[in-house]
Amino acid sequence: MKIKKIKLLKALALTGAFGIVATVPVIVSSCSSTSENNGNGNGNGGTDGNTQQTEVTPAIKSEVSLTGALSKIYDTKTGTDRETTSQLIVKDIKANPENYFTNGEALKDVIASATVTVDGGFTESTFTGEAYSVWSAKADVKKGTYSQASKQLDIKSINDLQTVLGDSAAIKGICDLIPNLKLNNGTDYKVTNNGLSLSEDLLHINVTAKDGQTDVSMDLAIPVSDLNLKIDGLKISVSGTGIKTSELTTNYKFNIGIDNTVKTLTPAAVTLAEADRTNAEKVLEKLGYATVSGSTYTLDQDKLADALGLYNCKFEAVKSEKDSTNNNKYTVTLKATPNDGYFWEDGTNGAKEEISFVATFS
């Protein structure tokens, strides 16, 4: 399963590293115009002059699989200048045709000025009930974050969440993996149509259930890196000077990457023997971010993810170093590696070791 730059969700149609498979050949056609000069007095005696005008035919890839920032497919602005998911995909097609066409290099010079349209069948949000600011503020709402143990979700639009999260039993399984959302006698789980919110790389959804005879309302926060926009049969139309008018179709998948911006973490001061303060695992255990059995330390991945705002990564302790000006402060450094199937926003999936925070000891 990303500080964060994403604001309130309005009409959401959620629609990098590149892995694309196709076998469509490069196609270039030539149009000839011929003029004959018959005895025009210039001594050329009836030579023919041919002017070649090249027209490139776009050859779409059958599968387009991309990874990148949420902003590539969703505009967080709410004003009249907000761009739709279709418009954002068009911008990417023009900027990076090699990701969409087998002859992308040949298209670079002509597609930038071409007319390109995209039809993914995107629909307006049906989450039109109570606004998030209303339902989430109620005193009895339970809050929790989608577990790293839960699967990524393929959606065609945000409305798919009401089906891809599954039936009552499936949603119960998701909630049972989240300590704050686990109910003793939970039944009748469902996703409501109340308003969504997108903030700090988390998409907030209202889930209701019954705990015995008691109605329960929950704020389920799903990291956006758990969402893949998957459109089978994405339609792309292209026309313009130097490019053959074409109506094309591809299977499109966009894996939303992990934003590696880290929240400022300032845990409360704890007591730990000075000799143990340079042991990062012992420090994490003392702070409540790890457990220990014998000599084996296990980091609480979900708890660290929530604390750091960095989701769908495996964290490992690297080091704990004393501050040069304060003997009671230590900088704890972690390594974060995207889980299988996840990537950073830049499309890479290698470990990042600059994840750190300051621990204070008393």
From Swiss-Prot:
Its main location: membrane. The keyword Membrane applies. It is found in: Cell membrane. Residues 33-53 are annotated as: Disordered. PROSITE patterns: PROKAR_LIPOPROTEIN. A lipid is attached at residue 31 (N-palmitoyl cysteine). Residues 1-30 form the signal peptide. GO terms for cellular component: plasma membrane. Pfam families: MpPF1. Major M.penetrans antigen. Belongs to the p35 lipoprotein family. The dominant B-epitopes are found at the N- and C-terminal regions. This is Lipoprotein p35. The lineage of its organism: Bacteria, Bacillati, Mycoplasmatota, Mycoplasmoidales, Mycoplasmoidaceae.
